[in-house]
Swiss-Prot record:
This is Protein GrpE. The keyword 4Fe-4S does not apply. Its main location: cytoplasm. It comes from Limosilactobacillus fermentum (strain NBRC 3956 / LMG 18251). SUPFAM superfamilies: Coiled-coil domain of nucleotide exchange factor GrpE, Head domain of nucleotide exchange factor GrpE. One of its GO terms (molecular function) is adenyl-nucleotide exchange factor activity.
Length: 195
């Protein structure tokens, strides 16, 4: 009987070995399929990583562009503010210039009596104070008389023949003074030019 049991156990063990081999073959067959599935997942994940990296790079680029635009806008705003402050008194100065012209005309009048002299002295003081106030704000008269004609700051209203020691294209008479604020012409000088 012991022999029969031994045969039975060997017979039962033999199918177990066959089952083990079959299971191993199934597992071996499943492994490439599992590896193929994992490879696909890895490829998908790598693709997602690449897409997300590209999106991140695009966002970084957009962010840098937005920051640069903001910096440019800030610089432009500051420059415009500086220009506004620099030329702040332009309109007021243009309104005052005719008053200054009238004061100059009043000073050109010849007076002989004491009252006229006192009045002229007062006009001269007002004129001087007004010119000083304009100069304090960088509003200056254009130097034109006996200077070469400059079309950027002067306007020729008449030409005359050059005489004596006058050079051609030289201002021989100023009819109305011109003024500049910093580098901007408020009013060109009205001049007569020798030809």
């Amino acid at each position: 009987m012991a022999k029969d049991e031994e045969k039975n156990s060997q017979a039962s063990a033999a199918p177990n070995e066959g089952e083990v081999k079959a299971k191993q073959e199934q597992t071996s067959a499943k492994e490439p399929a599992a590896k193929a599935g994992e490879t696909e997942k890895v490829a998908d994940l790598q693709k997602q990583v690449e897409e997300l990296t590209k999106q991140l790079d695009d966002q970084k680029d957009q962010n840098l562009r937005a920051q640069a635009e903001m910096q440019n806008m800030t610089k432009r705003f500051k420059k415009e503010q500086a220009q506004l402050l620099k030329y702040d008194g332009q309109d007021l100065a243009k309104g005052i210039l005719p008053v200054l012209d009238n004061l100059k005309r009043a000073l050109e009048i010849e007076v002989e009596d004491e009252n006229g002299q006192q009045l002229k002295k007062g006009i001269q003081m007002v004129h001087d104070h007004l010119e000083k106030a304009l100069a304090d704000h960088d509003i200056k008269e254009v130097e034109a008389l006996n200077q070469p004609f400059d079309p950027t700051t002067q306007q020729a209203v008449q030409t005359v023949a050059a005489s004596g020691d006058q050079k051609p294209d030289t201002v021989v008479q100023v009819l109305q003074a011109g003024y500049v604020l910093h580098d901007r012409v408020l009013r060109p000088a009205m001049v007569i030019v020798a030809q």
